[in-house]
Amino acid sequence: MTAFPRTVMLLGSGELGKEVAIAAQRLGCRVIACDRYANAPAMQVADTAEVFQMTDATALKEVVQRHRPDVVIPEIEALAVEALAELEQDGITVIPTARATAFTMNRDQIRDLASGELGLHTARFAYASNAAELKKVAAPLGWPVVVKPVMSSSGKGQSVVQTPEQLDQAWEAAMANARGTSNQVIVEEFLEFDLEITLLTIRQRNGETLFCPPIGHEQERGDYQCSWQPAQMSDAQLQQAQTMARTVTDNLGGAGLFGVEFFLCGNEVIFSELSPRPHDTGLVTLISQNLSEFELHLRAVLNLPIPQLTTAPAAASRVILADRELKTVAYEGLEQALREAGTQVLLFGKPNARPNRRMGVALARGEDLSEVRAKADRAAACIQVLDGSARR
């Protein structure tokens, strides 16, 4: 039997990390929240906070070695992954593994693994290390194409390119938003897909893999805007997605929840990307499931049982975005947003705002998907993100 409390360190303290911290504390864990800026959302509910550049390998190793947590849970992509590998060799448990974190931080590594080594169905793709090479490799894929940095997060630096003349601009956008030291992009054929889904995949230490009902979602500028559960797909498509998700997560190893993304194109299921942690589209599970994706992640990480997973007939989420730069923030409209039954609003507690920054999410549940999607949209539309300095 494992004794509690356990010490959990979060590398990344945004809105997803905040929910992981809350789930961990409900299980009696001590939480250390780390990020590059002070007062990040998870720090507001953690026992201890550490502020440092997590791309700095020396700083990262010093903080982890000083606290010696039972588990280290990466929550963002911008990390010194080489330091995680060294820490793992020194006996620190990295979730799910240091290798999984490194692979999924780099689009080229996870794509080469999925398409090359594991034979999963992906969009056609190529890599380029400069603008001239990008023009050469993009043309055979047909137009339009999608250009992304191999290292970035939340869709940053992603462009849909309609003509060859737009490739220089796409290259500049990718380089301006790339994470780390990479100067490479991945260019993909543009898929005319019917639906994007996330399959939350829970890999347990007992070897059993569980799946949440699929989550449909829509993106703008590479960022999630809304999600709903369950996504409508055939049994055959779901079986294909589960088989691919199990294949890739088994290869990456470790324990925890993975967000595995797919495109549905007709009867085809095409692997897109993977996050070795709770997924932003999975925020809907806070209202849709008896155990949210954050609780499921912690149970798998801490080797706790998951005896039953139940889901509402229909649930949906809609993000709440800022529309301008704000040094401090305040909110209006919460009373109106919560008037409908089966509705919740989460405001993440981010200390400042910028255009299109995700500041919160509206959640709704009910019996009908179209009904709950509209209800979440109405609730989100009620919330205004305002200048906090004028309201003190």
From Swiss-Prot:
It catalyses: N(1)-(5-phospho-beta-D-ribosyl)glycinamide + formate + ATP = N(2)-formyl-N(1)-(5-phospho-beta-D-ribosyl)glycinamide + ADP + phosphate + H(+). One of its GO terms (cellular component) is cytosol. Its EC number is 6.3.1.21. GO terms for biological process: 'de novo' IMP biosynthetic process. GO terms for molecular function: ATP binding; magnesium ion binding; phosphoribosylglycinamide formyltransferase 2 activity; phosphoribosylglycinamide formyltransferase activity. The keyword S-adenosyl-L-methionine does not apply. Pathway: Purine metabolism; IMP biosynthesis via de novo pathway; N(2)-formyl-N(1)-(5-phospho-D-ribosyl)glycinamide from N(1)-(5-phospho-D-ribosyl)glycinamide (formate route): step 1/1. Signal peptide: none annotated. The keyword Membrane does not apply. Mg(2+) binds at E261, E273. InterPro entries: ATP-grasp, ATP-grasp_carboxylate-amine, ATP_grasp_subdomain_1, PreATP-grasp_dom_sf, PurT, PurT/PurK_preATP-grasp, PurT_C, Rudment_hybrid_motif. N(1)-(5-phospho-beta-D-ribosyl)glycinamide binds at E15, L16, E75, D280, K350, R357, R358. Belongs to the PurK/PurT family. Involved in the de novo purine biosynthesis. Catalyzes the transfer of formate to 5-phospho-ribosyl-glycinamide (GAR), producing 5-phospho-ribosyl-N-formylglycinamide (FGAR). Formate is provided by PurU via hydrolysis of 10-formyl-tetrahydrofolate. This is Formate-dependent phosphoribosylglycinamide formyltransferase. It comes from Synechococcus sp. (strain CC9902).
